[in-house]
């Protein structure tokens, strides 16, 4: 698994990679994760079930994405892949340059590749044009592509000019046991609306800023709980100050993923004002916690939950405010029942199912033959009149770099890594102490604390 987005940063892609890796390990596969360093988290870390994570010291430029390195990442990537005896490289995220680099190097080394797209992009603005061209470059020689929704699949096929037969739809999921409802935590005096999101423009925070004062004026018994961080947090604070809503709009800042459920069970309604969304795992988590979901009707959101669990609004201030006001009235009149939501969601979404479907994709690409270099160059040449020639040059240089690395540091000289996936890493409350063969109680306590911190 390769992506710029992984723990300790919270988010949907991060959670997807971790949970999918855990379930694949349970199915008997060896899985490692390659990501960039996060502050002092550098080097190799071992997480739950012996999941090995390589935090590579690379510089980030924007929203935790690394600067495109192309060839400078190749030596360490090659070393990791050979050490761990990797056969399939699975990248995540269109905006992850680390993912794109890894897929290109993996194909040069003759490895099988898979890519999962978690986002939707347009076709008109400059940022989308550059991203789409980069995606087309990388996807020209990828073995298979996975999308998290049918809307995302259509978007990715158009952006990367892919054969639809090479693109599958496998949704996100959740661990339902970690998102159980608790009605006793919700306020009896107020109707609480929860928002958990990164506070960026594309997440619809401007809509949220416009809607909150209107709803608070119309419904005196409503309050908001907002969790998340980002550049729009300043605008939210200013809105709170302007309308004097400090006692009705609570801002929690960034929360860890293991704290999301504790925030959700404080509410009755979950509001999701995003302007673009490929799937929206947080919607499933909210419904599992027994919250009624209100969301903008964008992207793959309509595919996520059945109609009795959610209500949609256009991504406009007036329509979102009217829809939210209508749901609040229905909720106060006891017309909305959420008692069965958790069991329904538990039956609909499972990481085991996601892992088994992903495993079938892996099996299918393992039977494919690797292309010769000349055939790969033909695929890249079709990426555009000028871009095609540039991409061919990059691939040719990448091949020469691989030959040079093999001459300087032959694969036979790279020591294989120890297989860490064993029962001693399957830590539970009952057998944790027994899994650590240490005689010093003080050292055992320190290691226990460190391991639990990493596992979180």
Curated annotation (Swiss-Prot):
GO terms for molecular function: phosphatidylinositol N-acetylglucosaminyltransferase activity. The keyword Zinc does not apply. It catalyses: a 1,2-diacyl-sn-glycero-3-phospho-(1D-myo-inositol) + UDP-N-acetyl-alpha-D-glucosamine = a 6-(N-acetyl-alpha-D-glucosaminyl)-1-(1,2-diacyl-sn-glycero-3-phospho)-1D-myo-inositol + UDP + H(+). GO terms for biological process: GPI anchor biosynthetic process. Its EC number is 2.4.1.198. Keywords: Glycosyltransferase, GPI-anchor biosynthesis, Transferase. CDD domains: GT4_PIG-A-like. Pathway: Glycolipid biosynthesis; glycosylphosphatidylinositol-anchor biosynthesis. InterPro entries: Glyco_trans_1, PIG-A/GPI3, PIGA_GPI_anchor_biosynthesis. One of its GO terms (cellular component) is glycosylphosphatidylinositol-N-acetylglucosaminyltransferase (GPI-GnT) complex. Pfam families: Glycos_transf_1, PIGA. The keyword Heme does not apply. Component of a Phosphatidylinositol N-acetylglucosaminyltransferase complex. Catalytic subunit in the complex catalyzing the transfer of N-acetylglucosamine from UDP-N-acetylglucosamine to phosphatidylinositol, the first step of GPI biosynthesis. Belongs to the glycosyltransferase group 1 family. Glycosyltransferase 4 subfamily. This is Phosphatidylinositol N-acetylglucosaminyltransferase gpi3 subunit. The lineage of its organism: Eukaryota, Fungi, Dikarya, Ascomycota, Taphrinomycotina.
